[in-house]
């Protein structure tokens, strides 16, 4: 995600972490991952003695890209099984319920300051998504598209792997998207826009979109007050 100005302290911290942990350009070499465990471990409220342990929480939310597979929120699919990957605009992802699974509601085990740390990460993630979506809606940025549907060969039918809210924040970072798409290309997996993108008529639905963004803003304020 591109740098944003006027962010809250929580969002600025998360933005800095995303930039610090960006993958190298091109297809992934080995494995790259970033998730909720890394964020909890990096937060100032987390006791030092627990940082190594909370990193194991990444399977509750995050992204992993390896030479063999891609992983969203603990669910992994091998590149060899993937039929295609469809992208959606960040605004559409938000509009179609992508933020319904709040980070502070994840079934993460108790640890000291759990509520405060998860609340801070949730506020930060929502704020970054909201800032990017507003900038895009107002024409101030190029369209941000994230890999929203990883379609793969299931036992009986084609199945889909989709990112949760935290994974979407990570995938919205340009370096992560570039690494993801380059790795997909290296495995001859196509990455194409979804053909049923509901945002094709975004101009006609501007009021609805702004209403949705206002609702996300209200959720951020509620998390701040909680």
Positions of PLM-derived features:
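Eukaryotic intrinsically disordered, low-complexity regulatory linkers and tails enriched in Ser/Thr/Pro
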Residues: 1-62, 71-73, 83-226
């Amino acid at each position: 995600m591109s740098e944003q100005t006027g962010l809250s302290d929580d969002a600025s911290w998360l933005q800095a972490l995303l930039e610090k942990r960006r993958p190298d350009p091109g297809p992934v070499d080995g494995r790259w991952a970033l998730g909720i465990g890394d964020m909890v471990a990096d937060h100032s409220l987390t006791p030092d003695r627990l940082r190594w342990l909370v990193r194991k929480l990444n399977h509750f939310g995050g992204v992993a890209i390896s030479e063999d597979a891609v992983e969203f929120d603990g669910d992994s699919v091998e590149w060899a099984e993937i039929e295609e990957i469809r992208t959606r605009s960040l605004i559409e992802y938000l509009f179609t319920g992508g933020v319904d699974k709040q980070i502070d509601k994840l079934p993460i085990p108790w640890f000291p300051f759990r509520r405060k740390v998860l609340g801070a990460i949730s506020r930060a993630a929502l704020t970054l998504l909201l800032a990017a979506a507003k900038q895009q809606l107002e024409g101030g940025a190029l369209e941000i598209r994230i890999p929203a549907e990883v379609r793969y060969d299931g036992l009986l039918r084609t199945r889909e792997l989709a990112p949760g809210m935290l994974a979407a924040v990570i995938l919205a970072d340009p370096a992560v998207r570039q690494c993801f798409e380059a790795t997909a290309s290296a495995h001859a997996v196509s990455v194409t826009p979804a053909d049923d993108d509901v945002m094709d008529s975004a101009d006609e639905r501007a009021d609805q979109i702004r209403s949705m963004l206002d609702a996300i803003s209200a959720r951020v304020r509620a998390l701040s007050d909680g």
